[in-house]
């Protein structure tokens, strides 16, 4: 079995080794199972006692059952080796799987590109509308400041005249009230001097 487990280098020899292992394991399972069935048959005439024959048959059945289990494990190992062989040496299948995966990724990339282009167009349209709204509102606010020079000068004169007209009454109001304020001033008498003389 150890010589059968050694994996040759060439693919052809390796496949032949796999085939031989498969046949040997299947033959081992069939032979041991057949012998177990034969052992289960009860014989009438035996050279040894029935108890001794029973113990011998029991031991033989255990050994052959262990051989069947070992052959089954060998088949499972063979399946694992075949999978590894196909993965490492089946280049057409590997290339086909790689090409299929590349096609899936390219389709996904194209779909992402289309979505990004659509999103870019929508953002551009919204940005353009926002710019138009911003500049239109800014221009309406700046129309009052963007007047011609003569009109701006005329408005400046009007503002100056209105300011002068408002300040003139404020300046004149103290003069009109000066007379009564002066006439109402109290007369201070000198305590040590003579009082006012009366002229006749």
UniProtKB/Swiss-Prot annotation:
Coiled-coil blocks: 93-122
Keywords: Activator, Coiled coil, Nucleus, Transcription, Transcription regulation
InterPro entries, per database record: Med22
Amino acid composition bias (Gly residues), ranges on this chain: 190-200
Annotated localization: Nucleus
Region (Disordered): 167-200
Listed GO CC annotations: core mediator complex; mediator complex; nucleus
Subunit structure: Component of the Mediator complex, which is composed of MED1, MED4, MED6, MED7, MED8, MED9, MED10, MED11, MED12, MED13, MED13L, MED14, MED15, MED16, MED17, MED18, MED19, MED20, MED21, MED22, MED23, MED24, MED25, MED26, MED27, MED29, MED30, MED31, CCNC, CDK8 and CDC2L6/CDK11. The MED12, MED13, CCNC and CDK8 subunits form a distinct module termed the CDK8 module. Mediator containing the CDK8 module is less active than Mediator lacking this module in supporting transcriptional activation.
Protein name: Mediator of RNA polymerase II transcription subunit 22
Gene source species: Rattus norvegicus
Gene: Med22
